[in-house]
């Protein structure tokens, strides 16, 4: 019995320590922890919302913006970063405030650096992959409470970070959620087990100026850190279209069109696919009942060109769900023939 109690005490002590001592930022074998699978950028609206664009999604009941003021702490050296900021009783009253999205160097935290070739640390650190400097490796730490709609109860809730440089560690309500690198890619996390709809929820994350992934991000550009793109929460039905990838093409000597549609479903339920033109007229329909590929044919569609960028809207819905996923598509064919790149022949 004493051994059991001792083991329990050790485990209780180890849990918070484990949440503060991550090494992913210098581990080349790990570029994500608990990150949701990458997917196409399609947003699920509710029936009747009629959204089709990034701007429209902000008016959807499935969307909750994370833009705005966040409590913010910035340190010059990674060794000086706070390690217990994710605790619910942490006192952040002495912290600054920063806008999200927001680049540190454009808000007075560090200096923007332009590098054509090589790495921004080259004057004070000898490259030794996967290790990156601790000194001058700035770290920004964010905290904010977010009221999650009570109407999201029973939904699956995700966080979307459009671009965070160079990485992100994420906590919700005092619990570690996950990690992501790949700073110019979107990172999404399933927050369903951590959030409480109808209540204020504490979201915390920490960002390093450099991580091991920075060795692969040494292109000719300004080196800037922080949150560079839109961030938000979004709600989804449990039974849903998790991903839809649409590839348009032209056939029959560039006359007719075909859509190759790749669906990822969380449940094998019928899916209805409807293609409408710019005036809202239905021009083709299709269906699917499981994850995988399907096709839709369109007779003599309007072609997409740079001069006439005509777009159709493909709408996908699943039986038993009031989610509507619109995808803009244009029919074109790009080919390399001889020494020329041809569009639509």
Predicted features, each with a name:
Residues 152-155, 195-200, 297-311:
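Short glycine/proline/serine/threonine-rich loop/turn segments at secondary-structure transition edges
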Residues 170-172, 256-288, 294:
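Beta-strand-rich binding/interaction modules
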